[in-house]
Amino acid sequence: IISDTIFEIGLTPNRADAMSHYGVARDLLVALKFKKLIESNTFLKDLPKKNDLTFNKNDSLNINIENPELCYRYSGIIIKNINVKPSPIWLKEKLESIGLKPINNIVDITNYTLHYFGQPLHAFDLDKIKGNIINIKSPKKETSFITLDGVERKLDFEDIMICNGEKEMCLAGVFGGLESGVSNTTKNIFIESALFNAISIRKTAKRHGLNTDASFRYERGVDSNMVIPALIKASQLILELSGGEIDSEIFDFYPKKQDDYNFEINFDNVRKIGGFDISNQEIIEILKLLEIELEIVKDNMAKAIVPNFRNDVKREIDIIEEVMRIYGYNNISISDKINSTPSIPVLKNNHNVQQKISNHLVSLGFHEMINNSLTKDLYIINEKEYRNKEIALLNPLSKDT
């Protein structure tokens, strides 16, 4: 890296929306606008749209999703006559700055787009897709599969697999297959952009001991509305850096649309729970900047409609936290009053008796001991009273317990 400024951001697992450069910029824009540090007419760059590409609809694939509960959305595009080669310096430096090793222009573009938008992509060698068929399904029998790292893995019946007309090609949302991946001789490719079930991806990643950039994001939740823009962005870069032409329409199978969340909030609760004075108008302004729409129900009540990319905001308390976060915790003054309600616990009689006996014995000079309930089996092995009654630990920390 010749010269660059790198920010390392610590994210909590619930903030899947900020696991990309676009997501961080979107959140930063909200804070800067509310604090009047930038002009109110400042906006993020428009997301790529279908009319940004020129399509030659000569080729097609038959795509089938076996279980829509495991694959919510599956999209892709065919690009032919590409030239696989090393990436230009600017792209290599971008990837190296975030700790990624450049491989070739096609793979590098998918990685770049992943970190740009937070949407995982995968490139298949089109000529390896036998029968022009893509099936998204789980294995029906025990079988082995060789991943990109050359390791042979036994598939589980719960794994989601991307298959062609003959066999498996990819561990969906986790890791690609060795045979179907892009190589230096690849001329035609199929770019996949999809949305898989987060729980299923997490189980597969843990089962096979794989923690990839793709699985990391799928486990935490991916924005369904970013599937197509990311695919278009990657296609634009591929045409620019490797040549070729688009030879299909955008395939987009979306059998079960992901709806926005909606629930009621009370403006008074924001003030009461947050512990600060904020007007309804300020609350509305913050939520509007966060792209959370409000439909006023009555005076201090409203229905909040939360965009799909904020899968961590599902309750009123989440809204309150968001308002406080953007308003600024440092701007919330600490009360000079402390309210407390002292209470005297009522102890059970047997505990009272025990305490009185303990106190009396201590006053006479005795010492009270609390022994570890865990002990060596050696100590009781010859005691008939305890033989065959001991409870063994499955995973003891040492031989002494």
Predicted features, each with a name:
Residues Y329, S335-T401:
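Polar, glycine-rich mid-to-C-terminal structural blocks
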Residues I1-N350, Q355-I357:
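RNA/tRNA-interacting regions in translation and RNA-turnover enzymes
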